[in-house]
Amino acid sequence: MEVKVFRFDATKLILSKLDNQPIVANLGPTSDELWHAEHRDRNFYTYGNMGLCSSIALGMSLSSDEKIISLDGDGSLLMNLGTLATINRENPKNLIVLVYDNEMWGQTGRQATHTSTGTELVEVAQGCGIEKTELVDDLESLSEVFDK
């Protein structure tokens, strides 16, 4: 796998686009990097709940009018794919789910995830009915998509 965007750089870019909106960060390195990029009282670090980052963000989005950002990982999302179907059913207009896909379960020993062998999470999300999906692999594209 060729690394085109480092998660830390992407996280810093996302933070630069936000005011004080809540961010829910996946466990492990994603939470660590969010902390180091900019620790804020409204960051929610999800240690100890692998697979639930986007589910927590969904619940927050349904109970608030604020924009809620989920910084999830491919391994975490693969552990709870039902979240995508539920996000489609609930259809929150204030939820943004970003999935960092490094093709591995980094928190449990760097085992390869299904995305390393062809599972396309954008297509899975679309199959669940989520129409507004984007695949980005550079910071410029991430910035453009985030501004939409």
Please tell me what each predicted stretch does.
Residues M1-F6:
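Long, non-catalytic terminal segments
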Residues R7-K12, K17, E33-K148:
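Thiamine diphosphate
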